[in-house]
Structure formats: structure tokens, C-alpha cells
């Protein structure tokens, strides 16, 4: 691990520990890396929040399941996205080239958002656990985009603890990043913005 990567990964870890002890380091707790080449057609707050949860901004992150890089892309998913983008797929670049990883991951997020009609809850569930698992959950638990199904209750019914926690942590971060990036505290209809409908 190079010195730069150690610093980035370490700074978020230190910020989390510091916050637990009552001394929050806000700029390090929710970093907004200006060096990343963000796709203007994808919600920057969502991308940053996914990166924060997936890899803590460590570009060479590797999971036990084989997910790689900042946005923890599975190689097969990354390969398919690269094909759709008509760019060369290079597995090694997933952990060495931040902007390559973000480009593929952002496109995949955009694809999922379109597939699930803007619902961040369903998008994040699919991103973390896979569309196949989400399809089963929608069949078993109903669709949280529909009236009469509380999205917050739906999240709690997800059988995978990791995915339940993942959705909550990412949505929390999205709200904070929205505030940081806009420079003002928004008061949107959060249910509609994040869950895809009004309560």
C-alpha cells in the first residue's frame, strides 16, 4: 500500500474513532475528493456515499468475495459495464485507476437507478446484494415504492444484516453529502427523494 493510500484510508478511520470519542473531524469524516472525475449525470452525493461505505476511499480495496477498488465492483459486473460503455476492460485498473473504477461504478449505479425508477433503497439493495436477491425480496416482501408499504419497515425485513446496514449507512451519508456539496441544509421530502414515493 502506497503512502497516499495509507493516508486516505487512515484519515477516515481516525475521523470515525475521533467522532466516537466526542471530537468529530467533519472534513475527514465525509471527504469530498475533488480529484475524482465524476459523471455529471450521476448523483455525486450517492457516488461518494457508496465509495465511503464500500472502501473508505481506499482505491486498492479487495473484498473476500472478489469485489475491487473504490466502488467494490465485481469483475464480471465491471466487464459488462465496460462493454456497454465501449471501453477496454482492464481488471488491474479497478484497483489502480480511481477514475476508471468510478466511471464503471457510476454507470452501474445509474443503470440501477433507472431500472428501479429512481428508488435509492432498491438501487442500494441491488448494488450490495445483487439484483437476483432483490427480485426475491420484492416477491416475498412487496415493493416499497407502492403505497401501503413503508420503505423503512421494508428495509428492516431484508434478511441480510449487511444489506440492511448498508442501505441505512449510505442513505445517511447521502443526506450529509447533499448538505456539504450544496452548502445549505435542505428540507426536501426525504421519502420521495430517497425511497421513490411519499409516505
Predicted ranges, named:
Residues 4-199:
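Catalytic glycan-binding domains that act on GlcNAc-containing polysaccharides
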Amino acid at each position: 500500500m502506497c503512502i497516499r493510500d495509507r493516508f486516505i484510508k487512515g484519515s477516515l478511520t481516525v475521523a470515525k474513532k475521533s467522532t466516537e470519542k466526542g471530537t468529530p473531524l467533519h472534513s475527514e469524516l465525509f471527504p469530498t475528493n475533488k480529484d475524482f472525475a465524476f459523471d455529471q449525470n450521476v448523483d455525486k452525493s450517492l457516488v461518494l456515499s457508496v465509495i465511503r461505505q464500500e472502501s473508505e476511499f481506499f482505491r486498492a480495496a479487495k473484498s473476500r468475495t472478489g469485489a475491487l477498488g473504490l466502488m467494490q465492483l465485481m469483475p464480471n459486473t465491471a466487464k459488462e459495464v465496460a462493454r456497454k460503455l465501449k471501453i477496454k476492460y482492464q481488471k488491474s485498473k479497478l484497483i489502480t485507476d480511481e477514475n476508471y473504477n468510478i466511471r464503471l461504478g457510476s454507470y452501474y449505479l445509474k443503470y440501477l437507478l433507472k431500472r428501479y425508477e429512481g428508488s435509492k433503497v432498491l438501487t442500494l439493495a441491488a448494488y450490495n446484494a445483487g439484483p437476483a436477491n432483490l427480485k426475491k425480496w420484492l416477491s416475498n416482501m412487496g415493493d416499497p415504492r407502492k403505497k401501503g408499504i413503508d420503505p423503512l419497515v421494508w428495509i428492516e425485513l431484508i434478511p441480510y444484516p449487511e444489506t440492511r446496514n448498508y442501505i441505512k449507512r449510505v442513505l445517511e451519508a447521502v443526506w450529509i453529502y447533499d448538505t456539504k456539496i450544496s452548502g445549505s441544509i435542505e428540507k426536501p421530502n426525504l421519502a420521495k427523494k430517497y425511497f421513490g414515493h411519499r409516505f
